[in-house]
């Protein structure tokens, strides 16, 4: 934790904790940047810039190639090299319009479990999803206890208590859902809603089955969920996808603190190689040319881009060509955009299911 003081009083702070972030082909030790702020009385004095400078220097010294955060104001963090790396979506589904476009065979059985049992059965499912989804981060047992399954009154925002449903096949957990039932009635008619905090399936069939369970809960009028992946199966399964009211927003931002190490840590979809010229004025050790495999080079670049743009393509959430269209990438060598997009392609849309 970095803090700024004025005459002995704390006027600003910026925290970070370590986790392993999934990237295409593996995982990377990452600084999860959080609780960043400066008192209103001390704005416009360069305090945030100094804290970001000290924090990124420390992250580099600890050997963490990446930093990631959720941005309350994205324009602030772009100045320090963070790029939008993933999107997410919210849904608000009327239960009367939750039918699937085709029948889905229901596999397994669902059990409601207590939080102590959930601490045993849910993490293995999460870990399987995490291992194949860029943008997710590994959770420790303590994180599960204190952040995911802890359910004090202040976290409920007036809603119901945290419920946990586990879908099992031959006694083995294959999916789970964390949700709240917020009961309400108007003129004796149920108008409540299911608030889905997290739903994961180790296999596509299990994920679909646990969502079908959530959509079929009685006495509820709607199902709400936030922080969903852009490739969510309900977008293709819903008989009336417009009724999902799927709204897209920004997800995590990624900053390559050590460009060479970060590029070397992920895998690529082709055997091609090219040279990327990185512009990084805030972390000058990155201001250089790198091969896609992470080697610094004196060769002329095939592409030239600022480091925040590299953060946007790193997990596969955006393409070089998309960013070139808005002036964020310069194609130096003809055909380099297509080659880079083929290299950085990811099978899954990057997704982070939890704000930290």
Feature names for model-found ranges:
Residues 52, 57-71, 218-229:
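Conserved GNAT acetyl-CoA-binding A-motif
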Residues 14-17, 22-27, 39, 44-45:
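An N-terminal, globular interaction/scaffold subdomain
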Residues 1, 8-13, 27-30, 65-68, ...:
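Beta-sheet entry/capping signal
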Residues 23, 102-356:
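Intrinsically disordered, low-complexity, positively biased terminal segments
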Residues 61-65, 70-91, 209, 230-245:
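Conserved active-site alpha-helix within GNAT-family acetyltransferase domains
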Residues 2, 10, 14, 36-37, ...:
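N-terminal membrane-targeting/anchoring modules of bacterial envelope and secretion proteins
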Residues 3, 9-19, 32, 37, ...:
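Conserved beta-strand in the GNAT
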Residues 33-38, 43-60, 203-215:
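Conserved acetyl-CoA-binding loop-helix of GNAT-fold acetyltransferases
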């Amino acid at each position: 934790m970095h803090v700024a003081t004025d005459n002995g009083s704390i006027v600003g702070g910026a925290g970070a904790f370590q986790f392993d972030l999934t990237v295409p082909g593996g995982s990377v030790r990452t600084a999860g940047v959080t609780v960043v702020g400066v008192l209103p009385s001390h704005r416009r004095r360069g305090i945030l810039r100094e804290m970001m400078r000290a924090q990124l220097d420390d992250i580099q010294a600890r050997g963490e190639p990446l930093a990631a955060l959720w941005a309350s104001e994205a324009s602030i963090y772009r100045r320090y090299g963070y790029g939008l790396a993933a999107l997410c979506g919210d849904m608000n589904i009327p239960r009367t319009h939750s039918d699937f476009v085709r029948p889905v065979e229901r596999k397994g059985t669902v059990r409601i479990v207590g939080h102590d049992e959930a601490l045993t059965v849910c993490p293995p499912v999460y870990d399987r999803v995490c291992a194949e989804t860029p943008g997710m981060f590994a959770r420790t047992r303590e994180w599960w206890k204190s952040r995911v399954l802890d359910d004090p009154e202040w976290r409920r925002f007036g809603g119901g208590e945290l419920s946990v449903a586990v879908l099992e096949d031959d006694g083995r957990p294959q999916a789970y859902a964390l949700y709240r039932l917020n009961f309400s009635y108007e003129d004796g008619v149920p108008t409540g809603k299911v608030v889905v905090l997290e739903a994961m399936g180790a296999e596509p069939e299990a994920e679909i089955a646990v969502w079908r369970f959530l959509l079929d809960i009685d006495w509820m009028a709607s199902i709400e969920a936030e922080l969903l992946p852009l490739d969510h199966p309900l977008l293709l399964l819903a008989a009336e996808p417009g009724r999902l009211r799927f709204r897209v927003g920004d997800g995590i931002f990624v900053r390559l603190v050590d460009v060479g190490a970060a590029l070397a840590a992920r895998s690529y979809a082709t055997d091609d190689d090219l040279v990327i010229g990185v512009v990084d004025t805030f972390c000058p050790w990155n201001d250089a040319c790198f091969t896609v495999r992470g080697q610094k080079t004196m060769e002329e670049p095939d592409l030239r881009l600022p480091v925040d743009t590299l953060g946007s393509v790193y997990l596969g959430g955006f393409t070089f060509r998309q960013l070139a269209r808005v002036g964020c990438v310069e194609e130096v060598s003809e055909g380099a955009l297509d080659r880079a997009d083929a290299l950085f392609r990811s099978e899954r849309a990057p997704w982070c299911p939890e704000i930290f």
